[in-house]
Amino acid sequence: VTTAQTTELDVQPTPLALLLLGREADPKSERGVECPGDLPSPSDPDLVERARAAKEKLGDKVFVLGHHYQRDEVIQFADVTGDSFKLARDAAARPEAEYIVFCGVHFMAESADILTGDDQKVVLPDLAAGCSMADMATAEQVAECWDVLTEAGIAEQVVPVSYMNSSADIKAFTGKHGGTICTSSNAKKALEWAFEQGEKVLFLPDQHLGRNTAVRDMGMTLEDCVLYNPHKPNGGLTAEELRAAKMILWRGHCSVHGRFSLESVRDVRERIPGVNVLVHPECKHEVVAAADYVGSTEYIIKALEAAPAGSKWAIGTELNLVRRLANRFAPEGKEIVFLDKTVCFCSTMNRIDLPHLVWTLESLAEGNLVNRIEVDKETEAFAKLALERMLALP
């Protein structure tokens, strides 16, 4: 269970000139996000100076984390950038920072709170910055799934493996039931470890990362995988299907990566002869199978860094990152385009904008703790256990 808190530390409250733009302060408000179109317009440039001034006033008391999918206007104020796990570890390595401002989404801030010290306070600039995929697996649904596995007589054979992109509750469930967490970079190692512990894996919440890793990296077949739908009785599966399966995949997906299609790949190859198609493993299996290269966000960045001048690339991942990489490598003559013709970005990531960041930094600078993300101790203990198992992977 996670609580989001707004606490006044000073009897003189900070004037909140920047409102929350009418958004609900509900981290679980985003479910099944549809593509909202092109990126929002840049925020008022006058806010840049306000953000800079507030950050300078806070000094070493604040450490700002910026996920790769954040807007440029926000990333410019990040002390470090990276994927969710790297950022959580970076925060833990800065114990002198009283405030960790996480420019990302809710589950990321939870992970940072789990890995940082008790005296550090993790803040999310907009509490409505949730994650539709993380919300696709609730603690109640996963507990019910475990009951189904128990009734099928296989629970003792199953090891849960949860993607980093999951809530603290799901990470805790995983830790409590002998499982581990994985990232898109180490999913193969996590599965290898899990199959040393048991005969089957319950992979959640992203079906595509689980399927792609099992088939592409582990040599399994699509028939070895079954899809558990939490909205159907018994997950829509028979006991016989569960007993025969090696991989029990949760019916969850990323709303952005799930939009890329086989048609997207075919179209870009027709439009740009000689293009290299590079996609994230959260994409559908047929997209991954049709791509030239597949890898995590960090893999994508390193691949483009190493790419020769004049090469052409179509990238299947979040739009903010693709645009940033296209601009970065344009002087080297590398042509980088978004894989799909329909422009789409992660709308929940983009809830963290410059007005919210300014409001957060100015509030903290005036002594007002806002939008704190705090995981309860029992949940934290089991979630940390699952994360520690991941850290111990070879």
Feature names for model-found ranges:
Residues T2-G316, N320-P394:
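Active-site loop-to-helix "anion-binding N-cap" substructures in soluble metabolic enzymes
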